[in-house]
Amino acid sequence: MRMAESNKLKTGIFSGSFNPVHIGHLALANYLCEYEELDEVWFMVSPQNPLKAGTELWPDDLRLRLVELATEEYPRFRSSDFEFHLPRPSYSVHTLEKLHETYPERDFYLIIGSDNWARFDRWYQSERIIKENRILIYPRPGFPVNENGLPETVRLVHSPTFEISSTFIRQALDEKKDVRYFLHPKVWEYIREYIRQSITDN
């Protein structure tokens, strides 16, 4: 296990498709910075997996641009395309290993939902991830976590639950609903313009 060092920056790795990023993502990361004393949270956009058919992922560059817009005003947020430059498919264990190697001045904390923790044993080299990294679990409805049974490197955070999903946002947009208050204002405006431009081009 890599022991945390007080002189290193505590950096949360919030990895996801962000398809698209919404206020639930931002509010959770805000909570982790302010209440769990993370110095920064990196929104690490997961690339499209060419081996995974049938996904509804928006283009990589669009999802990354929306994360950039959503995070640029808060100094402790950072957008990241780190996984775009790794061999695919990119497993979390390899991403974390490369992060430690590239940024030795930082301590990294993997941020996952309790729904993912419930099936964490299916992750590639999950035991190694637990052994070599710190993990922060945030609550998700329907997936309680027994804090007493957690490994030393894993901790449950008591953040508010945000029952907003990217799937809901996409469906609402398909139905031409006005969901501006579910998104950062810059993200909302960019998506509106993107849709308008797509209609014009077609």
UniProtKB/Swiss-Prot annotation:
One Pfam family matching this protein: CTP_transf_like
Lineage top rank: taxon: Bacteria
One annotated GO biological process: NAD biosynthetic process
GO molecular function, one term: nicotinate-nucleotide adenylyltransferase activity
Coiled coil stretches, renumbered: none
Pathways involved: Cofactor biosynthesis; NAD(+) biosynthesis; deamido-NAD(+) from nicotinate D-ribonucleotide: step 1/1
E.C. no: 2.7.7.18
Keywords: ATP-binding, NAD, Nucleotide-binding, Nucleotidyltransferase, Pyridine nucleotide biosynthesis, Transferase
Catalytically driven reaction(s): nicotinate beta-D-ribonucleotide + ATP + H(+) = deamido-NAD(+) + diphosphate
InterPro entries, per the entry: Cyt_trans-like (IPR004821), NadD/NMNAT (IPR005248), Rossmann-like_a/b/a_fold (IPR014729)
Family, similarity comment: Belongs to the NadD family.
Its biological purpose: Catalyzes the reversible adenylation of nicotinate mononucleotide (NaMN) to nicotinic acid adenine dinucleotide (NaAD).
PANTHER family from the UniProt entry: NICOTINATE-NUCLEOTIDE ADENYLYLTRANSFERASE-RELATED, PHOSPHOPANTETHEINE ADENYLYLTRANSFERASE
Protein name (database record): Probable nicotinate-nucleotide adenylyltransferase
